[in-house]
Amino acid sequence: MEININCDLGEKSKHHSDENDPKLLEIVNSANVACGYHAGDEDSMNQVVKICKKNGVSIGAHPSFNDPENFGRKRLNLSSDEINKLLIDQYEILQNIAEKHGEIVTHIKPHGALNNMACEDIELATIIAKSICNFNKDLIYLVPTGSKMEEAAKKFDMRIACEIFA
């Protein structure tokens, strides 16, 4: 078993500061980068990607519901097409920024309510897993151990990393 220290970063918003991001990027192996829907913007994504590259940290997309007012923590009921679009849009903006630095997005981990809902709901978990497979089947999908997300990911034979919190 390999341990990968992972952290959510680039989450500058009215709810959070990103002042500690550079220090955290000295100790983590991989970063889940906010993609602008719950927090962050192109500037913060660019800064995190730049430091990730410097420190050899894997870059991951951290997509969420478009809910900056509640930091992506409000549960929203969206159609499968809407879920697919929000995942693709957020992944693509981060991937485009990463490419400008000669990097790629290596993994994806949903944020907040989107993640929490998918942990409990196999239908939503399946929509997310299928969407990820459709836009980049090589991404590592970070999922909570024993969740509906893990179950759905296995149906699609996805590369997964099971997370635990310490």
What feature does the model see in each segment?
Residues 21, 31-38, 69-84, 118-122, ...:
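Glycine-rich tight-turn/loop motif centered on a GG-T
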Residues 13-45:
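A short alpha/beta connector and helix-capping loop motif
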Residues 26-30, 53-56, 131-138, 154-161:
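Glycine-enriched alpha-helix->loop->beta-strand junction motifs that scaffold or abut catalytic
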Residues 68-107:
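Glycine/small-residue-rich loop that forms an oxyanion/phosphate-binding "nest" at active or ligand-binding sites
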Residues 146-166:
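Active-site rim beta-loop-alpha module in soluble metabolic enzymes
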Residues 22-26, 47-60, 99-101:
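Acidic (Asp/Glu)-rich catalytic clusters
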Residues 100-148:
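Hydrophobic, well-structured mid-protein blocks that either form specific transmembrane helices
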Residues 3-7, 31-33, 59-63, 106-110, ...:
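Hydrophobic faces of well-ordered beta-strands that scaffold small-molecule active sites
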